[in-house]
Amino acid sequence: MEEFQGYLELDRYQQHDFLHPLIFREYIYALAHDHGLNRSILLGYDNKSSLLIIKRLISRMYKQNRFIISANDSNQKKNLGYNKNLYSQIISEGFAVIVEIPFSLRLVSSATEIVKSYNLRSIHSIFPFLEDKFPQLNYVSDVLIPYPIHLEILVQTLRYWVKDASSLHLLRLFLHEYYNWNSLITSNNFFFFSKSNPRLFLLLYNSHVCEYEFILLFLRNQSSHLQLISSGIFFERIHFYEKIKYPVEEVFANDFPAAILWFFKDPFMHYVRYQGKSILASKDTPLLMNKWKYYLVNLWQCHSYVWSQPGRIYINKLSKHSLDFLGYFSSIRPNLSVVRSQMLENSFITDNAMKKLDTLVPIIPLIGSLAKVKFCNALGHPISKSTWADSSDFDIIDRFLRIFRNLSHYYSGSSRKKSLYRIKYILRLSCVKTLARKHKSTVRTFLKRLGSKLLEEFFTEEEQILSLIFPRASYTLKKFYSGRIWYLDIFCINDLINHE
């Protein structure tokens, strides 16, 4: 955030809310490249030619009446020799940085001190909440947040945050030129958009989800006698991790009549979301859950113009339903305990049944993911990673170790860790087969020559840490390791098996 203040003329642009002139500044594209999610803005070009491309792009934008160079410009590829989508990629990633500035300035220039709740940024911070709340609840519903049906909906969402009309028109023009503005949004289009420009996609999608949750929170506060103390939404982007307050009453209050608010006076309604999947859970009767379901459908249809079928939102009894959320299968199971009590001369035995959140590793989907990246076949039998055979022995072992430690780190909250032993076996044997293939040897011959050194490397991170804390207490170590451990430093699921 400090880099934005150092580069930008904040007083000038913040006073008038003019953002579009920044599209002509070279440092904007440098920031987009240095702080990009995948640094793909100038992929395949060296620094010298990259700077030349940016200068040429800015020069063409100055000379033309419109900002965006048309993808149908026949002379572009013929004269310059570049891919016709390269200019689109550069402008869109630079534009994403520009539109992020109003969000960033609210955090940097806030008069009140911002407390950086790093622990709440972790994905694992959701599970202690589920452990605490869900055993007392009865009904749950898995809800997929639908995409807006037209790109104009995303642009209209940004107008509450970005006051510069020229920037919004530029965004419309960009989407019209390069992403087939007139077509409906499908999952394939969103997938292509997210891959080609993840920064702009996250900005648009998060603003859409943020607005939806602002409405949800506002109506929840209006309808409940137990007002929420803190109000706000967490952004998925790491830069926007703080809770943000915004006057949604003026913007959204007219979209829904006050008569429907009395339906939702439930102090035990809980809402959890990660990315596009959310969970609604309640302690009350299924009738209230049904009312919440139709409320959400009306919210999407009336405000976001998204068609959604109520029949596709299922309400399940929590005691008989397993949640597929954040890579875990979570369910509520009874935990029986026998207590012997004695009063005067009489003793009696009581059975106490307590509900407990059970989190399991989805072993079959996990093996499927390993098979997709060629660590094993579809049946889970390890195979060699042929694309890594040209690397050094140290690099091969280090890559396998990082993958397993990341998986072990993330699934440390599992109630039953025996499933991880199979993943450990697959990765260990795949590593041995890769090394044997590199040295043109058999697995048995290679293991005889190597000994047990390779096997010693495949310890989980939890075992290493706990062995340092409890060097002599083997029973305590085993007890701690068999329990669940939630880490507060995991911010992204997609990088768990990033082996590059």
Curated annotation (Swiss-Prot):
GO terms classed as biological process: mRNA processing; RNA splicing; tRNA processing
Main localization category: plastid
Keywords: Chloroplast, mRNA processing, Plastid, RNA-binding, tRNA processing
Keyword Nucleotide-binding in annotation: no
GO cellular component terms given for this protein: chloroplast
GO molecular function: RNA binding
Subcellular location: Plastid, Chloroplast
PANTHER family: MATURASE K (PTHR34811:SF1)
Function: Usually encoded in the trnK tRNA gene intron. Probably assists in splicing its own and other chloroplast group II introns.
Family per similarity comment: Belongs to the intron maturase 2 family. MatK subfamily.
Name the record gives this protein: Maturase K
Organism: Prunus laurocerasus (Cherry laurel)
